Amino acid sequence: MENKSTDLFIKTSLLKKKYNIYSNNNNFSFVISKSLFYFIFLKLCIFLYLLILLLHDHKRQKKEFNSIISLLEKFQFKNKNENENNFGTNDIFLDNYETDIYNRIKKKLLAFPCDGMHKNQREFLNGVVRKFRPKKILEIGVREGCASSIMLNAIQDVDDSHLYSIDLDKRDFIGKCVYKLFPNFLSKWTLYKGNIAAKYMEKIGKDIDMVFIDSAHLEPGEILDFIMVLPFLSEEAMIVMHDIANQITATKRFKGWLGKRNEWAPYIIFNSIRGKTYLPSGKNLLTHDIGAKRLYFNQKIYFHDYFRVLGGQWQYFPKEEFINEMKEYIKKYYDSDCLSIFNETVDFNRKFVKQNPINNIYNDNNINTK
């Protein structure tokens, strides 16, 4: 009996030594006290309770998420552009132009001192018109009328087709190429001079199938032009823009090359327009200086985005009378949010252009003083 007691004492002592347990009354106790055990047990219960709530909430959130996705899919079904689905995101290169009809006037155009459109740009413009055969074309920015002549020539065999051209400049040389070289085209041409596009849009009317924009190049230039014509365009209208890479391609071999480096407006709005992109064939996507966009359906869902593009720092400020005309136009054809964005942008840039000496130089470049 004594041996058993001795063995028990030795084992107890060893356990105390192993777990470093000591007691004042020399009674053996376990490492975890009752209070610590209850505390851990309580924590475990709380954790399990929260886990159950989380799993339940996850199921509820998943159900709500699926219902939202279902609603979005219904919305997208109504508003998603068919072309956007079918075309994907790749650009389309017009490799094979119909050039026969252009070749008829090519020599005459080359002999006439005309605006700066290179051979491939002229062929591209002709190719777009021949491919899509628009009935109603609008041109903004005419100058001598080289592009006007190309488009008029391209629609000679398109029944009931007509070109409307607008230029802010009202001097005599505007459209001279058409008047002098191609008077036989005049039956399909209407020219407006001396005011902004908003002034003439109601006269021209809706269902415009194609727009060619080649105007100020400085901001807000082509951005404003696009906003002014947008409410009058047909579904899937073609937007063709020239000089969309001036800020990249301008080098010292061009007259006024340094100024061209600041010509961002065509690049900005062309790459903001929601539509399928058409470019001349070539490897370098950045340096194509002409391109086209075929608008996606339901452009109204992009209206606010287009007005926000105006929010940059303008390089010139239009005449106040033009600003007022545009305000009335926007009030009539866009919603109140678009008008608010326009007003805020105008107020900012009115101060900015006047205070910035660099922009005051652009303010005197005859864009808004003709």
Language-model regions, residue ranges each:
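S-adenosylmethionine/decaboxylated-SAM
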Residues: L14, K18, A111-K370
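Membrane-proximal basic amphipathic "stem/tether" segments
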Residues: E2-N96, D100, Q299-D364
